[in-house]
Amino acid sequence: QLTFTSSWG
C-alpha cells in the first residue's frame, strides 16, 4: 500500500 501512496505523492 505504501507503494501506492508514493505513486500519488
Swiss-Prot record:
Keywords carried by this UniProt record: Amidation, Flight, Hormone, Neuropeptide, Pyrrolidone carboxylic acid, Secreted
Modified residues (Pyrrolidone carboxylic acid): 1
GO biological process: flight behavior; neuropeptide signaling pathway
Record GO terms (molecular function): hormone activity
Similarity-based family: Belongs to the AKH/HRTH/RPCH family.
Role description: This hormone, released from cells in the corpora cardiaca, causes release of diglycerides from the fat body and stimulation of muscles to use these diglycerides as an energy source during energy-demanding processes.
Name by which UniProt lists this protein: Adipokinetic hormone
Species assigned in the record: Helicoverpa zea (Corn earworm moth)
